Amino acid sequence: NTSDGRCEFAKTNSSQNAVESNNQSQKAFRLLLQATFGPQKKDLDRVIEIGETSWIDEQLQYSSAYDAAGDNLTTNLEHYKIIARMAEPSTYSDNTSSFNNNFHGRTSDYQSAAWFEKALHAPDQIRYRVAFALSELLVVSAAKQRTRFRGDSLAYYDDILAKNAFGNFRNLLDEVAKSPAMGIFLSHQGNKKYMSQS
C-alpha cells in the first residue's frame, strides 16, 4: 500500500491506455513488416487509425499500373525503359528504338532499379509484396547470361507477377509459362509448336 491507500500495482486509466496503444502499435508494426517492404511512419499511423482489416482492404482497392492506360502509373517495364533512357541516352534515344539489341550488360541493373522503386515507393505495397513472394515460387534467374542481358524480359516478368498478384492462379501460371523470361530460363524460347501426325 502507498501512503494514500492505493496499491502500488494498480493501474491508472492513463497507463492502461498507454499499454493498449503500445499493443496496437506493435500489432500494426508487425502487419507492416509482413505486408510491405518495411514499415513507414505514415503507414503505421494509417493502420492504427483505420485498423488492420481496413488497411488491407484499402491496399487491395488501390489502382495499379495494370488497371487502365493513361492513369500516370507506370509498369515495371515502362519504368525500366525510363531508367535505361536516363542511363544511356545515346543507346535508347527515342521511344521506337528496340531495347537490348546490343546486349549491354547493365540492363538487369535497370530492371532491379525499377523493381526497387516500386517495392519501396508504390502505394499498393501488398501487391508488390505478394508479387515478390510469387517470384520466390515461380523463379527466373538474372544469373543466366541471356536473362541478365535481357532486363526488359525480367521487368515484364515482374509485371506479370504484380498484375496477377490478386488474381486467378491459373491465369498467372499461363502468363508465366509464356513469358520471355521463363522461355529464356527454361530454354523453351523459340521451340516449334508440336505438330500432330494425324
Please state what every model-predicted region is.
Residues 1-113, 117-121, 125:
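N-terminal module-boundary/linker segments of secreted carbohydrate-active enzymes
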Residues 42-44, 48-49, 99-198:
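Primarily short, surface-exposed interaction patches in extracytoplasmic proteins
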